[in-house]
Amino acid sequence: MTNIRKTHPLIKIINHSFIDLPAPSNISAWWNFGSLLGICLIIQILTGLFLAMHYTSDTMTAFSSVTHICRDVNYGWLIRYMHANGASMFFICLFLHVGRGLYYGSYTYFETWNIGVILLFAVMATAFMGYVLPWGQMSFWGATVITNLLSAIPYIGTTLVEWIWGGFSVDKATLTRFFAFHFILPFIITALVMVHLLFLHETGSNNPSGLISDSDKIPFHPYYTIKDILGVLLLILVLMILVLFSPDLLGDPDNYTPANPLNTPPHIKPEWYFLFAYAILRSIPNKLGGVLALVLSILILMLFPILHMSKQRSMMFRPLSQCVFWILVADLFTLTWIGGQPVEYPFIIIGQLASILYFMIILLILPAISLFENKLLKW
């Protein structure tokens, strides 16, 4: 009799995805981040569900309800800080996952890559709306500033912003709808993750060499299950160190002050994982131009398959492209730093130069270096 795991309609899907899946024999630790993102998503949905049981999405009580969760609910402080810092871990894994895809040329799987970019947008939207929910000063002013950017859209901008707000400013209606969207989006993300995996399993995984690995495959279980478990343990270790020792390390002290529309904080800035995009937004003096640059800074990822000029898929054997890649990483660190600084000299000019370099590397330098490396292959 055949094993139930290979015959049962539901179990065989799991079997083909996580047990008998043929995987390349040489994928490194950089391939762990997919499973880590899955774990992050599960942690966020579970902690978020328990937070939603005690949270109230009303401007009068939202801040107090979060305080109540931390003070009065059993282990409420733990759930709240796991959720807040879980978001940071989520983005660390996301950035490393995308970086891996860029370095090893995984973007040549068009559908998988494009759904991944859509997922990135969805996670960013979810995180933004989640940041508004505690209704602290930075929640309120962050929501005001970011939603206000849509008013830069010609003709329909102002109407659109008021429609999103549900009034003439960020208020009760805004908070209620943000809570509703923040609750539903992770489930949409989960569905998209399944589609992401569906397309990935159509082609099979890429590997560090960028070469076809059909002739050398190993079963996912036990080799990569045990490897993923190690990654998960390390992820949970880092998350719990963050939560239990310095839960407010990545947060903003301003968010411990209840939202006050009459008092603007001296420096309005988003969470650390949005700072690079925020720096790009601020580096353009024109409102519409800034908004376009902000959207394009993420949307540009969709152009990578088109801009791939090299005859090799991975950067493993392309030292010049490697140098440019790491300059891009350094540039993103610079943008993240600038995004958290006040708008004054010399930060303005550094931000503008870093923003120009970001788009230059992706649109011009990397493709040009790739073409040059193709020439070197013939020497």
Curated annotation (Swiss-Prot):
Q: What is its main location?
A: mitochondrion
Family matches, as Gene3D superfamilies: Cytochrome Bc1 Complex, Chain C
- The UniProt annotation places heme b b566 binding at 97, 196
In Swiss-Prot or TrEMBL terms, this protein is called: Cytochrome b
Which regions span the lipid bilayer?
A: 33-53, 77-98, 113-133, 178-198, 226-246, 288-308, 320-340, 347-367
Impact noted for substituting residue 233 to F? In strain: Isolate MSB 53282/NK 7980
Give the protein's cofactors: heme b
* Comment on bound cofactor: Binds 2 heme b groups non-covalently.
Note whether Ligase occurs among the keywords. Answer: no
Q: How does it sit in the membrane?
A: Multi-pass membrane protein
One GO MF annotation is: ubiquinol-cytochrome-c reductase activity
Q: Which residues bind heme b b562?
A: 83, 182
Further comment found in the protein's record: Heme 1 (or BL or b562) is low-potential and absorbs at about 562 nm, and heme 2 (or BH or b566) is high-potential and absorbs at about 566 nm.
Explain the purpose of this protein.
Component of the ubiquinol-cytochrome c reductase complex (complex III or cytochrome b-c1 complex) that is part of the mitochondrial respiratory chain. The b-c1 complex mediates electron transfer from ubiquinol to cytochrome c. Contributes to the generation of a proton gradient across the mitochondrial membrane that is then used for ATP synthesis.
What GO terms describe the biological role, i.e. biological process, of this protein?
Answer: mitochondrial electron transport, ubiquinol to cytochrome c
Q: How does it assemble?
A: The cytochrome bc1 complex contains 11 subunits: 3 respiratory subunits (MT-CYB, CYC1 and UQCRFS1), 2 core proteins (UQCRC1 and UQCRC2) and 6 low-molecular weight proteins (UQCRH/QCR6, UQCRB/QCR7, UQCRQ/QCR8, UQCR10/QCR9, UQCR11/QCR10 and a cleavage product of UQCRFS1). This cytochrome bc1 complex then forms a dimer.
Does the keyword section mention Phosphoprotein? no
One Pfam family it belongs to: Cytochrome_B
User: For a ubiquinone, which residues are the binding ones?
Assistant: 201
Q: Which GO terms describe its cellular component?
A: mitochondrial inner membrane; respiratory chain complex III
Where, subcellularly, is it found? Answer: Mitochondrion inner membrane
Against InterPro entries, the record matches this protein to:
Cyt_b/b6_C (IPR005798), Cyt_b/b6_C_sf (IPR036150), Cyt_b/b6_N (IPR005797), Cytb/b6-like_sf (IPR027387), Cytochrome_b (IPR030689), Cytochrome_b_C_euk/bac (IPR048260), Cytochrome_b_N_euk/bac (IPR048259), Di-haem_cyt_TM (IPR016174)
Q: What is the effect of changing residue 122 to T?
A: In strain: Isolate MSB 53282/NK 7980
